[in-house]
Each structure stands twice: as C-alpha cells, then as structure tokens.
C-alpha cells in the first residue's frame, strides 16, 4: 500500500504518455538502426526525470490541489505521504534519471531533459501556472521535450527534425490543455488558477483552440516535407489533424461545452499517439543539413 502511494505521486499516466512520445522521437531518428541499450537508457532515464518533476509538482501544488475535485485526493494533500518524504522521493528519482541519461546518452540529451525539467518545475509549477494565463504556453515547452530527447539521444544534435518535433508537440499541448481547462473549469476557478478559459472565457478559448490546431496541422507536415517521415505518416497526420479540427469547430454550436471539451481532449490523445506510432515506423533518410551544430 505504501509503495502504491509513492507510485501514484509520480503520476504514472503522465509517465506512460511520455514513454510513447520519447519512443516516437527515438525511432524516427534511429531509422531502423536501433541500439537496445541506448533505447532502454533513454526511456528509463527520461521516465525517472518525468516522475521526479511530477512528484515535485505535487509538492508545490498541494495548497491549490485541495480546492480541486480532481486532485484533492492526492497523497500529498491527504498527508498519506509527508512533504519531506515526497521531496526526497522526487529528488532521488531526478538524480537517478539525469545520472542515467548522462551516463548512457549524450550531453545534449541530458541538457534538453534538464531544460524541460526546469521549465516544468521552476517556471510553470512555481510561477506561471498560478499567476498567468500564459502558463499553459510555458508548460508546453516542457511537455514537448520527451520526443526531442528521444530523437537527440540518437543523433546527438538539434537539427530540423528535432525542431519539427518540438513545434508539433508544443502546438499539440495547447488545445489538449485548454480542453481539460474547459471541462474542469469549476476546479480551476475554485483553485484560482488563471488558465485561459478562466481569464478570458470559453468563447475566446475556442478561437485559440482552432488556431493552434491549424498551426499543429502545418507543423506535422514538416517531418514529411523535410524528408524525415514518409507518405504513410503524412496521410495519418492530415487525417487526424482534419478530424481534430472538425471536432474543434463543432464547439461553436455545441449546447454542452463540457461534453465537447471531453471529446476534443479524448481525440487529442488519439492524434498524438497515432503520430508517434507513424513516425516510429514510417521514417525516411534525413537531410544532411542541420539547424544547430552538435554538442560534443
């Protein structure tokens, strides 16, 4: 039972979602030439880093979590795990994760994981989530790191493929997160979290959702146009983007915003999972040019 508490505080659902993303980035870069030990180290290392960030986020958010129906049962709120124990748990996970990435991958991969960790814990959790409607945008940078980490673990450099992954996953995060904020609106209002639907209303948020999905659609094409992914990936990318956009547009005449937002959220998971799978299996030879020189 005690072990279960320590598992839950690390948000296993989020860890699993990030596993799919980091694997997608890795396989896209590997192009069929998989090094099992590197893949294992990347997946386990990043999972530990993500788990650490989630634990520290729970520690930071315990004062606002008690006001939200969805989070008031978290072990850091109920006291089933003490603050000191949770902090120690989070720090141990972080040290283990970063240590494994440094040992078995490369400095760039470790630095990217560190950047995502800093953004999530230091910028998003401690400051922007509580004080700004732009918190979601800041948080999207950390949410987009897993596939980039997986990709750069193979290449050791930040090239156009890595930049495309960063754009795709950043842009995906926005409608995904806004959908959650809409169907959990009362929770966010009760906790005083100034997400866009709270700060500017659902009508404005719907406009942002449509615009971000359009931008996401354009970004997904970059992997194919840049020679990183094939036509199978392209077909799936266009299909899921158009379907997601269609769901978003129905929000303008829906009678139930919460139900609509749940549908939008659910399909966002389908969309990003489908893209991660397709980029893993439908890869192409990368172009020789790169945006940024590799790190030693």
Swiss-Prot record:
This protein's GO CC annotations: plasma membrane
Primary enzyme class: transferase
Keywords, ordered alphabetically: Cell inner membrane, Cell membrane, Heme biosynthesis, Membrane, Transferase, Transmembrane, Transmembrane helix
Any Pfam family hit: UbiA
Function: Converts heme B (protoheme IX) to heme O by substitution of the vinyl group on carbon 2 of heme B porphyrin ring with a hydroxyethyl farnesyl side group.
Protein localization: Cell inner membrane
Gene3D superfamilies: UbiA prenyltransferase (1.10.357.140)
Protein name: Protoheme IX farnesyltransferase 2
Spans traversing the lipid bilayer: 7-27, 36-56, 83-103, 108-128, 134-154, 163-183, 207-227, 229-249, 265-285
Presence of the UniProt keyword Lyase in the record: no
Keyword Magnesium: no
Top-level taxonomic group: Bacteria
